[in-house]
Design a protein with these regions (language model features):
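Single conserved hydrophobic/aromatic residue that forms the stacking wall/gate
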Residues: 1-13
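C-terminal ends of transmembrane helices
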Residues: 15-28, 78-94, 142-149
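Small-residue-rich segments of transmembrane alpha-helices in multi-pass membrane proteins
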Residues: 37-49, 96-110, 158-169
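Helix-coil boundary and interhelical linker segments in multi-pass alpha-helical membrane proteins
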Residues: 46-64, 111-126, 172-178
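Active-site rim beta-loop-alpha module in soluble metabolic enzymes
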Residues: 71-121
């Protein structure tokens, strides 16, 4: 039962490596950015599959369907708000929409299943908190990657703070799997 979560964690580590390499090899920026997106998507899919495998109660399907719908709305909303938020996703538009859906789904699904269980399952609670921190981190990061005039020191500090908090919470959630 723990294997999908471990693979998810490993894929997220790869994401960090790919995205760091884009700063070293600037001429290959796009391939490293796409690789980072892809690794994170795959990692989150493993986290989501682990959550569904372990905690889903298919007779309570609303706790699964509702997070999917909300995540789709978040992804479409991100696309609709590109211009008003002065963002330019360019060639990364499609993968950004997919990425937004998957990251939102991890947060909303773990939160929904935590709610279904009365917030009594620490793995789900920590995964939910970690998912929220990932979403916040990525909102900040999207501004620094795709926004106008959003590479301020405060953005970099808050991005790293929320990102590492997310990593810590999700990794900690594995300790409570039974």
């Amino acid at each position: 039962e723990i294997m999908p979560s471990l693979v998810g964690s490993e894929m997220c580590i790869r994401d960090s490596i790919w995205l760091d390499l884009k700063w070293i090899y600037k001429e290959d920026n796009d391939i490293y950015t796409f690789s980072g997106f892809f690794s994170f998507i795959v990692g989150h899919i493993f986290f989501i599959s682990a959550i569904l495998q372990r905690f889903a109660e298919w007779d309570k399907i609303i706790y699964i369907v509702l997070p999917v719908v909300i995540s789709l709305i978040a992804a479409v909303g991100m696309l609709i708000l590109e211009k008003p938020l002065k963002m330019n996703y360019g060639k990364f538009k499609v993968i950004t929409v997919v990425y937004t859906f998957i990251v939102a789904l991890l947060a909303f699904l773990s939160g929904s299943l935590a709610l279904m269980n009365g917030f009594k399952i620490m793995t789900l609670n920590l995964m939910f908190a970690g998912g929220i921190f990932f979403a916040l981190s990525d909102l900040i990061l999207s501004g620094t990657y795709f926004g106008e005039n959003k590479k301020r020191p405060i953005d970099i500090i808050t991005n790293h703070t929320t990102y590492y908090a997310a990593q810590f919470l999700i990794a900690s959630s594995l300790m409570f799997l039974k």
